[in-house]
Amino acid sequence: MAGTALKRLMAEYKQLTLNPPEGIVAGPMNEENFFEWEALIMGPEDTCFEFGVFPAILSFPLDYPLSPPKMRFTCEMFHPNIYPDGRVCISILHAPGDDPMGYESSAERWSPVQSVEKILLSVVSMLAEPNDESGANVDASKMWRDDREQFYKIAKQIVQKSLGL
């Protein structure tokens, strides 16, 4: 199974290298281990995360693409769909099948036709448009709903930290 996963990851890396999506850089942490990737995601334009550069790690299971990877930001983040420890909570990273909570449709969840590029583009969209109904960070979700100005202020501080300012 790991051989299939490795071939798929190598093909996806080649595609990302030849045709990188705007504002995203991603690839294996080293050539010895294609199952751990690092990514840099630029904050989406015209959002409170604009100009930020946010590092993350993608950890792929040995049965990829049958199962989704896990993704975690390695910098400070304050966002409704990012746990305080950096783990990303987004439908595309949830295991295939029906949602036991009945919130997501199976079409929104992981399937083997998804790709690293689709994951990263989905995360960029998530940064731009948080889903406050599915709060991984309760404080950020509440602030996004009730005090948008304060949320933007914290996001701007995180952007500055991401740039070493």
From Swiss-Prot:
It comes from Homo sapiens (Human). Interacts with AUP1 (via C-terminus); the interaction recruits UBE2G2 to lipid droplets. Interacts with ubiquitin ligases AMFR/gp78 and RNF139/TRC8; recruitment to lipid droplets by AUP1 facilitates interaction of UBE2G2 with AMFR and RNF139, leading to sterol-induced ubiquitination of 3-hydroxy-3-methylglutaryl coenzyme A reductase and its subsequent proteasomal degradation. InterPro entries: Ub_conjugating_enzyme, UBQ-conjugat_E2_core, UBQ-conjugating_AS, UBQ-conjugating_enzyme/RWD. It is found in: Endoplasmic reticulum; Lipid droplet. GO terms for molecular function: ATP binding; identical protein binding; ubiquitin conjugating enzyme activity; ubiquitin-protein transferase activity. It holds the Pfam family UQ_con. Signal peptide: none annotated. It catalyses: S-ubiquitinyl-[E1 ubiquitin-activating enzyme]-L-cysteine + [E2 ubiquitin-conjugating enzyme]-L-cysteine = [E1 ubiquitin-activating enzyme]-L-cysteine + S-ubiquitinyl-[E2 ubiquitin-conjugating enzyme]-L-cysteine. Keywords: Acetylation, ATP-binding, Endoplasmic reticulum, Lipid droplet, Nucleotide-binding, Transferase, Ubl conjugation pathway. This is Ubiquitin-conjugating enzyme E2 G2. The active site is at residue 89. Residues 4-164 form the UBC core domain. Accepts ubiquitin from the E1 complex and catalyzes its covalent attachment to other proteins. In vitro catalyzes 'Lys-48'-linked polyubiquitination. Involved in endoplasmic reticulum-associated degradation (ERAD). Required for sterol-induced ubiquitination of 3-hydroxy-3-methylglutaryl coenzyme A reductase and its subsequent proteasomal degradation. It comes from the Eukaryota. The keyword Nuclease does not apply. Belongs to the ubiquitin-conjugating enzyme family. One of its GO terms (cellular component) is cytosol. Its EC number is 2.3.2.23. Pathway: Protein modification; protein ubiquitination. GO terms for biological process: cellular response to interferon-beta; ERAD pathway; negative regulation of retrograde protein transport, ER to cytosol; protein K48-linked ubiquitination; protein polyubiquitination; ubiquitin-dependent protein catabolic process. The gene is UBE2G2. PANTHER family: UBIQUITIN-CONJUGATING ENZYME E2. Transmembrane segments: none annotated. The modification N-acetylalanine is found at residue 2.
